[in-house]
Amino acid sequence: MNCSIQYPVRRNTILLGLSLVLLSGVLQLGVAVATITLVLVTGIESILGLGPAIFLAAGAFAALPAGRLMDRIGRVPVIAGGFGIGAAGCCLIALGCAIDNAVLVIAGFVAFGAMNGSVLLARTAAADMYPEDRRARAISYVLFGALFGAALGPLVFRPLFAGKDLELDTLVIPWLAAAVMALGGLAVALLIRPDPRTIALELHAAESPNRPHAPPAPVSEILRRPGVPSAVIAALASFAVMVGVMNLTGYIVVGHNHEQADVFTVISLHIVGMYALVLVIGALIDRVGRKPSLVTGLVIMAVSTIMLVWAESILWTSVSLLLLGLGWNISYVAATAELVSHASPLERGRLIGTTDLAAGLLGAGLALLGGVAYTEWGVAAVAIGATVAVVAPARAILFARRPAAAPEPV
């Protein structure tokens, strides 16, 4: 690949991975205490799932404009801007906890979610720099960084909770620490150059030297290209179910009479499942194909969610969440690689952004519904509902008829 010689692709890949280290570390705090933060600041226990739903919805709504902006001005400004917004959001949450102000906490959750929605588009930047037969691996290289975030999160946050009662004052310092980590992500993002979009355009021209560049197609047209619908379905189901279950983990663990600090153990192992094998998985997806990988990932997620019906110990809850992360990993990487391969460099941001918008809104809805189901009927209702939500799309993808070929991006 000529671009790998002309441009520092490896360096950019490492920096993108490092940005995911910091994002993952920050997100662990949100996953562990977002629900409890909002309950404490409002005093209303019936709003389980609302905190995660707020930042999931915010991330979803940020994803599409962030994707469009990536196609227009480049990947780096959007990733860096996302970290900046997230740092401001964490500061707002800390201030809201300090003065017991729910409005500030909610505003902070919105900014926190916008950071997640923007920075996760880094996987588009990873795929930009590699040829089609290596795109799943390229995405896996960057996502692997989040594994180290799984270690960074507990190292930073667990000592801040150790031996303390869970009150609003206890949450101020952890949220400020998260803001510092987000600023670190901003600094790392600004070191990425040239912008991966520039590399993608040159690589695309080298792969199709005799084909003129067409203007970006409307998203509605891209979504009709063969292979895209199945990838979108898998992306929506895997992401929505994963975040819907993950964001209730704090209350599920505490509800089984475990300590709040144990939540970080479970979440850390969940993130290990999400990312520990991602390098191997990326290579396997490139080898065995994306459609089988989409279905395999969803089936593993189904096994993990049904386990929650009887898993009460920290050990078995951790195993369930680890498998949930592993199944998501397979479906997510395969879906992203499939989507990127059916879009030109000037279409990828908006396609991934549109998918993330839908997945985030669905995830927010499932987090809210899961909170209601958990409050009214317990963990079993959450587990059974989540299992159905991944089995149905897996079956649809497996038995879908492949449509006639449609024009591919030029």
PLM feature segments, named:
Residues 153, 157, 179-205, 395-401:
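C-terminal membrane-cytosol helix-exit motif in multi-pass small-molecule transporters
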Residues 138-157, 358-366:
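Glycine-rich segments within core transmembrane alpha-helices of 12-TM secondary carriers
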Residues 3-57, 229-234, 242-253, 259, ...:
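Helix-loop boundary and gating motifs at the non-cytosolic
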Residues 84-99, 300-312:
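C-terminal ends and interior cores of transmembrane alpha-helices
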Residues 21, 102-117, 316-330:
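Hydrophobic core of transmembrane alpha-helices in multi-pass small-molecule transporters
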Residues 62-74, 277-290, 374:
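Helix-to-loop junctions at the C-terminal end of transmembrane segments
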Residues 1-10, 194-231:
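Juxtamembrane intracellular "pre-TM" segments in multi-pass secondary transporters
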Residues 34, 117-130, 330-343:
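Intracellular juxtamembrane helix-capping segments at the cytosolic ends
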